[in-house]
Amino acid sequence: MCAGFYVAVHPWLEAQSLHKVGHTGNLAARLHDGSYTTCFTDEWKYCFTLETSTKKDAQKIEAGVLYCAQFFRVKNKELVCLLPEKIKQLAEDVANCLDISYTLCDSPTYEMNDSTIVVEPSLPSDPLISKEKLRHLVITPVEDEEHFADDVLFFSTDETRTAIEDRLYQKEAANMGYQELRRSGRAILQMACRCGKTRVAYLILSNYLQGKVLYLVPGLSLLRQTLEKLYQYGISLKNVLLVGSDQTRIVLNHDNIEMTTNPVFIAKRIREAPSLLVIATYQSSTLLVDDFDLIISDECHRICGEWETRPFTHVLLNFKKGHRLFLTATPRYDTPLSMKNRELFGGVAFRYYLREGIEAGYVNDFELQMVAAPKLAHQPSNREETTKQIIVKQIIMALAYLKTNIPAPKMLVFTRDIKQARELYAELVDQGVYALIAHSTLPRQVILKTFTEFCSSKEPVILLNCRLFQEGVEVPELNAVFFAAPRHSPRDIIQSICRPLNKQVQKPHATIFLPLEVNTENVCLDRFSSIIPFADALASEDPRFYEHLLNPSEVAYPINWIGAHGSVSELLQLARHAIRYGTQGKIDRLTRSERLPWKAAFAELKRTVEICCRYPKINDGFHFGGATLRFDTWYKWVIKSYLQYKNKEPSSLEPYQVSDLESLQDWTTRGVGGPYPWEESMAFLETWLAQNKGELVAIDIHQGGWIGLDATPMERLSGVLTTVSQRDGRSYGKNKKLRPKKGFMIPPQQAEDLDRIFGKHNLKWRKDRVNGFLKEDEHGNYTGEPTCIQEAYRTFKEYVKTNPEYIEKYWPGYAKGKHKHQELPHIWESGLAPPRYKAFKDGNKQLIQRSPKKKDIKN
């Protein structure tokens, strides 16, 4: 008898890419016992075995393999969805880690006779194995397939060192990222695909090269690519350590370097080296020790997921030292462990939109083509078959559209799952379409061969996949992507869109195809529900698309419809309506304050501050993408979020937005506190009364606020007392004869301040009341004794005529017209002031451009 660990396969399981792992004390008899022959035919065979001296050793290997392949195991079964070569390597690694001697046998056959049929003694179901020893062997889940692609597809770039000129936004990103690291120890750089995040990371890590830097990447190919780029930028290989499972030597110019997974060597090198750059895969991060000054996590959205320790979260959750820099184009916020966690990830220190990269010429532009559902000659008997035939025809329509402009177009088709990819592939091939298919259950050599064939094809070709080529794979000649199934994750959508956006000389714009089950015979908003997540994701990366959705007549966008049976313009209008208002068509989803593109809204705020010398007023309007918006609503949201951020509360603002705000003149005083600072004005009032023997002298409370950033203390006091007078002029209680009013609205603390300051000088500031109501005549005119504030205004009106020196000193440039209180005269005259927002009873909203009257212009 021969004991051992085995991997067996049966045709029924092999069709699903499943393999049976197990252990036995009798390899010759195992595949002939009842558990194998009762439910299956006798077509079992061993892929390989590890013969061991005892059954207990074989059981330990099985337990170790199932632990390390836990993410690929069928629940409660000893079935693993991995290629035999991968399981073989894993089994040998487990045996070596557990110090178990074995003999490897590939595709063995064992002779079966009566002497081999022996009843095996039972063993404990859960053998004791050191999971700590095996933790570094745990295989990362392939739930999104792109991790698989990282290790399969790698195309070397030119590794020669060349002078590189940093782009302006890269310098800005590096500066803001480094400053945020110094301030809080953590920073996120959110930059669109293909905009040079690695270069920015290099500029930042250059500040830490006297110490130890860890650069984490999600796969072996990206590790090589990162090394090559850093080498081009000037990094010396003598201070570089590569941690990964590929033993192939990497040759760069005349230098060369190898990867390692030796935990003893890795720990010793990290601890003893005074300065070191470690580039490692997340999968190998459990081999590292916590001794770094800076940790860079590339494609950090892949860290997010369940709140548990796994290779991708190991460093994030267990390492305590060093600053943390996170790089991504698509942050992930929809998981238990998400990038909303400021303690772990920090905030976004720099943001660079996809549209910015396109307009700057670094990213290829693209168009959107929605593909209508074609009419079928024969209606299938079930819904699933109908959908499949419709999508096949839509793919063929999309390819035909590409061929009108490109001789040999290449199109990636993203499917819902591998099953759908196989079904579509079979249908397309049957219809004579040159189609290829790749998925993670295929051998690596097959995937690489398929991908190479796709890239080098001189004919129109389609490559079907689920998520294998969604991230990290460069296809310079790719012309289009087609979504054969809805995507709901913004990360998946943006990453997929970016696949064909490589910038190349004379390369035509890319095309994004969105199939819809819509035609003119049966149109309703629900038919557009599948594109709403897509539109939301794109609008967050492309402000131009956002503006187009608000008003397509003012902002053009390359979006069209192919295969429509009726009016294209009407279908596009319905699609835009569904995106903006949802399939119920009720709530405007786009004009919420938090959804306004930050750079555009902040630019208007900055313009108002720098040109108009003030912050927004309540009735300021904002013209964006043809939409009429109330700017004050967004401004109040900004102030609220800013205060939450400064108080270390959950906030919608990111560090780069806070930095923008704090760059504005007097932001923390006038921007946040408003034009009428209460405490500052009360201190000025108290000093004034003390110096002038209790005489308030002259205050203008009639024309409204003094809101300019250059306002004098007396002008600001006028604004404060104007507000006091207005609020004190409101009755409280119920009175049927008068229109209901809001009541006595001066806050108690402010009333106490006024009582204290005016009381010292026996000045009356409150209006007279009877039973809580103002003393008024039948016309609503106040009939009580004048307050000191009202008397001060009468004095002011006299001073305007008789005391110009006083007016010029405390109200410099004062004009009779009210425009002085709102804008500087030249701003008013030139029409640079923000337009006035007005909402009418019928729901209509307008922006009314402020224009001066002749009497408002001071000669």
Curated annotation (Swiss-Prot):
Motif DEAH box residues? 298-301
Binding residues for ATP: M191, A192, C193, R194, C195, G196, K197, T198
What's a Gene Ontology MF term here?
A: DNA binding
The UniProt keywords, alphabetically, are: ATP-binding, Helicase, Hydrolase, Nucleotide-binding
Helicase ATP-binding domain span: 178-349
Catalytic activity, EC: 3.6.4.-
Q: Which residues form the Helicase C-terminal domain?
A: 394-553
* One family name in Pfam for this protein: T5orf172
What is the similarity comment for this entry?
Answer: Belongs to the asfivirus helicase A859L family.
Put simply, this protein is called: Probable helicase A859L
Q: To which species is this protein native?
A: African swine fever virus (strain Badajoz 1971 Vero-adapted)
Lineage in the entry?
Answer: Viruses, Varidnaviria, Bamfordvirae, Nucleocytoviricota, Pokkesviricetes
